């Protein structure tokens, strides 16, 4: 086979085939996923606003990341609720959109109308309220989007002819791949907007920067609009499919079966509802009472409750599938639980390497585009290889992407800059180093989600999505805890001044950031690979 034919075959199997597999029914959940991706629109504003105006420590911010992650564990009762109210689940998208809009409006008020907002609550209090409202809104929408991905893959074509099992499996994998693609596509859109919005920002005065920050929060109100539009599109497509089936001469009985094939009567599972209620009361109680080691207690308690519910739920599966899905979930959990460096790395890049808002936007754009390319290129790899092999590859890639950050902390960029007449400087290295919030974790979720969409019992699809997503999302809480510990052991501080009085509240100290970066790199490489090795030696061995 010639090189040209090989390249043509590769492009066909990765890029063109993805386009061929696309169906209009995939679009409504994809719109909700895009809205979730676009949620990062305010991320760079957040980094600079927190750094310059909020006197919150790196450890506190990592801790806030923990609490912001807890609503994602609410996917359990919400997922089961979706199964119970399947035909009316779209209303939950409106609830989520309202919470997201409220969170955005609070931040807009905080930036543009600071004095008015401060007369009600402290700046830090408003920030915490906003930071906790948004994830609740996104989790509500995400649960519905997951359920919509199941509906997006029909069992028959528009003539009522049944698809083969293999065809349905391919459609589910494509739907889940496009779901991750949509989320990261949202990141790309965000980065493009930020690059444009922050053009020449370093030359602007403080008040002009504040004005741009506020404008970005106003633009972020497009997020709830997009997700709500997805619901209306789903209603339209359902009506159109019904008309096409009638036109094809499908009988009334078959028509009723096809249009309600996902509306299976589900009995309330009181273990799931009761366990979820215990979880919510437990989490809020510990948080409100300000118990010592609250985050650790909540994490351990949440893990035990979710594991108990998983044990109850997987009894619905055949024995072989039970062990396999547990092994798969554990491997993904460990991979996603590896700690990050915390906000100290971004502060160091701003203060010492002089990265500005526009350059951060450029970095996140490059990271997101490369991840999109990665998903397209690795789709055949993901379809043909086990999750164990995928996680090993992602761990190696993730740790390699941290090396430039470690190097730059120790002045590697000064050496390369002097060697190349200023060409390979800190910014050049940072562009190559796309590890900044790189969403590789999204890739690891695709095989698990596709497996659930295809194999979970029809009456518990949303519940399965929710329980296993809650478990893998708990890993992000473990990630936040790990980051908090690293930032408590090795303390990193940045300069902060009061927004109203301009009094300096704290000074910068990055002397211990290097140890944090080295620790993160080693953990990212070694721990997931060790977990894969242990699982593959046990009865939980996964070939999925």
Label for each model-derived stretch:
Residues 97-121, 396-423:
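C-terminal ends and interior cores of transmembrane alpha-helices
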Residues 80-86, 111-117, 184-211, 283-293, ...:
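Transmembrane alpha-helix termini and helix-breaking/packing motifs in multi-pass membrane transporters
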Residues 64-72, 223, 303, 362-371, ...:
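Transmembrane alpha-helical segments of major facilitator superfamily
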């Amino acid at each position: 086979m010639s090189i040209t034919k090989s390249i043509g075959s590769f492009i066909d199997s990765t890029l063109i085939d993805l386009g061929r597999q696309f169906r209009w029914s995939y679009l409504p959940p994809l719109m909700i996923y895009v809205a979730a991706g676009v949620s990062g629109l305010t991320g760079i504003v957040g980094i600079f606003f927190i750094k310059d105006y909020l006197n919150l420590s790196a450890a506190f911010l990592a801790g806030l990341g923990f609490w912001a992650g807890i609503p994602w564990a609410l996917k359990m009762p919400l997922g089961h609720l979706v199964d119970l109210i399947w035909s009316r689940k779209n209303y939950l998208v409106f609830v989520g959109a309202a919470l997201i809009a409220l969170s955005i409006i609070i931040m807009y008020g905080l930036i543009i109308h600071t004095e008015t907002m401060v007369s009600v609550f402290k700046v830090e209090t408003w920030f915490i309220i906003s930071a906790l409202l948004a994830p609740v809104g996104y989790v509500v929408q995400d649960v519905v989007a997951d359920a919509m991905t199941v509906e997006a893959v029909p069992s028959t074509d528009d003539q009522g002819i049944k698809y083969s099992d293999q065809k349905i499996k391919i459609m589910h994998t494509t739907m889940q791949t496009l779901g991750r693609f949509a989320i990261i596509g949202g990141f790309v859109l965000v980065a493009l907007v930020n690059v444009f919005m922050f053009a020449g920002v370093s030359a602007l005065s403080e008040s002009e920067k504040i004005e741009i920050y506020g404008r970005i929060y106003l633009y972020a109100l497009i997020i709830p609009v997009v997700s709500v539009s997805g619901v209306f599109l789903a209603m339209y497509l359902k009506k159109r499919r019904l008309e096409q089936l009638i036109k094809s001469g499908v009988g009334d009985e078959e028509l009723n079966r096809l249009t309600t094939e996902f509306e299976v009567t589900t009995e309330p599972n009181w273990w799931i509802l009761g366990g979820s209620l215990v979880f919510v009361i437990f989490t809020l109680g510990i948080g409100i009472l300000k118990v010592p080691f609250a985050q650790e207690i909540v994490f351990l308690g949440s893990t035990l409750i979710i594991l108990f519910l998983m044990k109850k739920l997987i009894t619905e599966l055949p024995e072989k599938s039970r062990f396999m899905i547990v092994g798969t979930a554990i491997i993904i959990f460990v991979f996603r639980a590896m700690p990050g460096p915390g906000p100290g790395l971004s502060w160091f890049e701003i203060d010492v390497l002089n990265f500005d808002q526009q350059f951060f936007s450029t970095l996140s754009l490059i990271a997101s585009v490369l991840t999109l390319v990665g998903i397209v290129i690795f789709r055949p790899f993901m379809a043909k290889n086990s999750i164990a092999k995928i996680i090993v590859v992602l761990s190696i890639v993730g740790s390699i992407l941290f090396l430039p950050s470690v190097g730059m902390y120790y002045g590697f960029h000064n050496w390369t800059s002097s060697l190349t007449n200023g060409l390979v400087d800190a910014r050049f290295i940072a562009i190559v180093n796309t590890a900044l919030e790189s969403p590789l974790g999204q890739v690891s979720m695709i095989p698990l989600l596709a497996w659930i969409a295809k194999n979970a019992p029809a009456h518990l699809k949303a519940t399965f999505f929710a329980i296993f997503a809650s478990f893998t999302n708990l890993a992000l809480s473990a990630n936040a805890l790990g980051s908090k510990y690293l930032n408590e052991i090795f303390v990193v501080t940045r300069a902060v001044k009061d927004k109203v009085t301009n009094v300096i509240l704290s000074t910068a100290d990055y002397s211990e950031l290097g140890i944090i970066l080295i620790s993160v790199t080693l953990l990212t490489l070694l721990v997931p690979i060790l977990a894969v090795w242990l699982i593959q030696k046990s009865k939980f061995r996964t070939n999925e």
